Amino acid sequence: MSVTTLLAISLGAILTNNFIFAQFLGICPFLGVSKKIDTAVGMGAAVTFVMGLASAFCYLINLVLVALGLEFMQTVAYILVIAGLVQFVEMFLKKNIPTLYTALGVYLPLITTNCAVLGVALLNTQNDYNFIESVVYGITGGLGFLLAIFLFAAVREQLEISGDNPKAFDGFPIALVTAGLMALAFMGFSGLKVW
């Protein structure tokens, strides 16, 4: 494992293989929580935290499952780990940052079923990453999610403020068009070569 490998994993997770724009994972909170920048950043930070921890714990769980010959239980075990981590984040936010807890509302418990969080754990196993690579991929994948939801929320806020949208595009339709255009912009990174 070299710094070049970690850099390639990081750039891939943030830009070229962004969970939102390239792999289309985590779309529900992306569309649901992106109306305000503050809420979007809070959700992105929570997802980043859970993805980083889930990557670490799921790597260790996978070692135990492989040693016991229970590889077929990976998905179930990963979901249980993610559910526990989300409960921890929910209790932490409720106690320490109640305004963010209220703003995230129903979307916070939905991190448990966020396919981006489960996807990072499964992709770590599929790509045969070691512990450090798994954690780096989880954290930078979360940062890519945070970047995507932040940029999308910023554009959505500006579109709401401007009010120049055709009536047929008000609300959700213009959000989908914006997400599509942003995905095209991120696809421009797919030709990026790292060393």
Regions found by a protein language model. Name each.
Residues L6-F21, G69-G84, V136-A148:
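Structural signature of hydrophobic alpha-helical transmembrane segments
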